[in-house]
Swiss-Prot record:
Its EC number is 2.1.2.11. Mg(2+) binds at D48, D87, E119. This is 3-methyl-2-oxobutanoate hydroxymethyltransferase. It holds the Pfam family Pantoate_transf. It comes from Moorella thermoacetica (strain ATCC 39073 / JCM 9320). Its cofactor is Mg(2+). Pathway: Cofactor biosynthesis; (R)-pantothenate biosynthesis; (R)-pantoate from 3-methyl-2-oxobutanoate: step 1/2. The gene is panB. CDD domains: KPHMT-like (cd06557). 3-methyl-2-oxobutanoate binds at D48, S49, D87, K117. One of its GO terms (molecular function) is 3-methyl-2-oxobutanoate hydroxymethyltransferase activity.
Length: 269
């Protein structure tokens, strides 16, 4: 693939206005960032989902700022053309607005991210506004918000009732007014996502939100079949790399035990 120019916020906005779909995938280290960018992704999300698919936690809640910065730095070292968005982890922005601005700044200054993402609706509007006023682009996240999944009754679809749907739509409008450049809609009915997308001036990025969002995001390990602890309904698995990886490792194990590796081709004279 030819070298691309860096993706910018105005370009993403123009894509929405032209009806061009935006592509986004998570990455958590140098190799995944390199491959995602080589595939031509518009955005890379260094998600706190790394807690589950990389660090082995049962949820995103234990992920720390230092862990997010560590992984964001690795992603940025690949020098991707894609816009890099990093998650603000649990308790990095809920404690106070100054804490939120400081931690968002760390992801930009220390991690090298282009933008940050946080979860929540009208309750986080003052936080979003303060971070944006500090010169840091913010992506919102509504619907199923994993950091508060217990409060929401677990990992389930949000916005099915009329009242829930109206609240999500109102939250979306409030976040846009506060200055978000884009909005993730996770696990909401497709019709609700379509209506919100049509009403908002900024791009929506869906994950389990149907086909009518302005873009889509999936977890790297999910779409490549690298994480098999569970697979949400909305995940389409484009490869089964876990199976291929185990097969390769088994072949290596067998060749070592049988004395077939290393052979002359892989040895020095």
């Amino acid at each position: 693939m030819a070298q691309r120019s860096r993706v910018t916020l105005p370009q993403l906005q123009a894509m929405k206005e032209r009806g061009e779909r935006i592509t986004m995938v998570t990455a958590y280290d140098y190799p995944s960032s390199l491959l995602a960018d080589r595939a031509g992704m518009d955005m890379i999300l260094v998600g706190d989902s790394l807690g589950m698919v990389v660090l082995g936690y049962s949820s995103t809640v234990p992920v720390t700022m230092d862990e997010m910065i560590h992984h964001t730095k690795a992603v940025v070292r690949a020098n991707p053309a894609a816009l890099v968005v990093a998650d603000l982890p649990f308790l990095s922005y809920q404690t106070s607005v100054p804490d939120a601005v400081y931690n968002a700044g760390r992801l930009i200054k220390e991690g090298g991210a282009d933008a940050v993402k946080l979860e929540g609706g009208q309750a986080v509007v003052p936080t979003v506004r303060a971070i944006v006023n500090a010169g840091i682009p913010v992506m919102g996240h509504l619907g199923l918000t994993p950091q508060s999944a217990v409060q929401l009754g677990g990992f389930r679809v949000q916005g099915r009732s009329e009242a829930e749907g109206e609240k999500i739509a109102a939250d979306a409008a409030a976040l846009v007014e506060a200055g978000v450049f884009a909005l993730v809609l996770e696990c909401v009915p497709a019709d609700l996502a379509r209506r919100i997308t049509a009403a908002l001036p900024v791009p929506t990025i869906g994950i389990g939100a149907g086909p009518d969002c302005d873009g889509q995001v999936l977890v790297y390990h999910d779409l490549l079949g690298l994480f098999d602890r569970f697979r949400p309904k909305f995940v389409k698995q484009y490869a089964n790399l876990a199976e291929a990886t185990v097969a390769a490792l088994e072949k290596y194990r067998d060749e070592v035990r049988q004395g077939k590796f290393p052979d002359q081709e892989h040895s020095f004279k």
